[in-house]
Structure formats: structure tokens, C-alpha cells
């Protein structure tokens, strides 16, 4: 099991990317020995307004999640069948190596779909720049569809050879599927 659970409240719990926040859950020992010293410098709580926004947003959480998960599975299936897509990484697909495990552990498979395209880095950027509904971002905290290129954003400080070993090629994209029709 997990000793610590970290939640971002920015995307799913907030629902609109209006707040920044999170929650850290752990044993009393972890909270006192590890987290408390950090909190003394940063403060342990978000603002009352952000807390209220998140609380209100939780009222629509089940509806939003149903839509996000359904859209993500549809997009993953579409990408998997497209000839310009090299591979799709999404646990909701039967082709995913851990699909059976994911079915046992999850009631839904999330809305983050990673995929690789055939082509050069320039081709990948051209693809991203031609998207009409999806916004390019390095922050995936919203209910609209957002895409990022990990090799030049989140993992840009890792040498290319190491990134490739980690499975983060120049053609890998991460798509946070939103609630659009």
C-alpha cells in the first residue's frame, strides 16, 4: 500500500482550473515528522475562497468525471486506430499491458492519454499548432482539453538519451482530455 497520498485539487476537484491546491494524506507520524516542518514555512491551508470554490465544485464532480472518462476512452480508441499514431498509452485500452490490473483497481481509467506520432519533432509541433479545440499547455489543470510535449516541457531538463530510456521520446504527447463534445 501507499504511505502517502497526494492529490491535486486544481483539475478534477476544482473543475475549472480556477484554484491551486492539493491535499496530502499520510500517517500521523509522517504528518508530524515530515510535513509539519514544511508547513511551518509555507502554511498548511489554502485560502478560504479557494476552499469554497473547490467545495462548490465537488457538487458537479461525478458528472464531470463521467464525461471526462468517457471522452478519454473515445479519444484513446480513435488515436489507436489512426495510421499516423505510433502507439497510445491509456490503461482503458485492451492493448495496454496493464489493462487487466487497471480494471481491477479502477472504476475509471482517467482522462490523461499519452501517445506517440510518426514523424519528426517538427512534425509533432506542426500537429500541435494545428489543433483547433485542444490548447497547448504545460499545465494540465482544467476541464478543457490540453496537450503538452513532455520532451520540451516537463522533462526538458533530462538528457535525450535518458528520456528515451524512460520512454519519453520526442514524438510523445500527453493529452488531458476535456469535457468538449
Regions found by a protein language model. Name each.
Residues 3-5, 23, 52, 111-114, ...:
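Structural motif
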Residues 64, 129, 145-181:
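PLP-dependent enzyme catalytic core of the Aspartate aminotransferase-like
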Residues 73-141, 158-164:
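Conserved small-domain helix->loop->beta segment predominantly found in fold-type I
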Residues 44, 87, 141-142, 148-150:
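Positively charged, small/polar-rich N-terminal and surface patches that mediate targeting and assembly
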Residues 13-17, 44-47, 105-107, 139, ...:
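Solvent-exposed alpha-helices and their adjacent loops that cap or buttress functional pockets
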Residues 29-31, 95, 118-120, 152, ...:
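Short, glycine-/Ser/Thr-/acidic-enriched flexible segments
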Residues 53-63, 110-118, 174-178:
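Short, well-ordered beta-strand elements within core beta-sheets of diverse protein domains
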Residues 1-84, 89:
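Conserved PLP-enzyme active-site core in the AAT-like
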Amino acid at each position: 500500500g501507499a504511505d502517502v497520498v497526494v492529490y491535486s485539487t486544481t483539475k478534477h476537484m476544482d473543475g475549472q482550473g480556477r484554484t491551486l491546491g492539493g491535499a496530502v494524506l499520510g500517517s500521523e507520524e509522517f504528518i508530524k515528522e515530515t510535513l509539519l516542518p514544511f508547513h511551518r514555512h509555507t502554511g498548511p491551508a489554502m485560502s478560504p475562497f479557494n476552499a469554497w470554490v473547490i467545495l462548490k465544485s465537488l457538487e458537479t464532480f461525478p458528472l464531470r468525471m463521467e464525461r471526462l472518462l468517457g471522452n478519454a476512452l473515445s479519444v484513446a480508441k480513435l488515436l489507436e486506430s489512426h495510421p499516423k499514431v505510433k502507439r497510445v498509452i491509456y490503461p482503458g485500452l485492451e492493448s495496454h499491458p496493464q489493462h487487466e490490473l487497471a480494471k481491477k483497481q479502477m472504476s475509471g481509467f482517467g482522462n490523461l492519454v499519452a501517445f506517440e506520432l510518426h514523424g519528426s519533432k517538427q512534425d509533432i509541433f506542426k500537429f500541435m499548432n494545428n489543433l483547433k479545440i485542444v490548447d497547448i499547455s504545460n499545465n494540465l489543470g482544467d476541464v478543457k482539453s490540453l496537450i503538452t510535449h513532455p520532451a520540451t516541457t516537463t522533462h526538458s531538463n533530462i538528457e535525450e538519451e535518458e528520456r528515451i530510456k524512460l520512454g519519453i521520446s520526442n514524438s510523445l504527447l500527453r493529452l488531458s482530455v476535456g469535457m468538449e463534445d
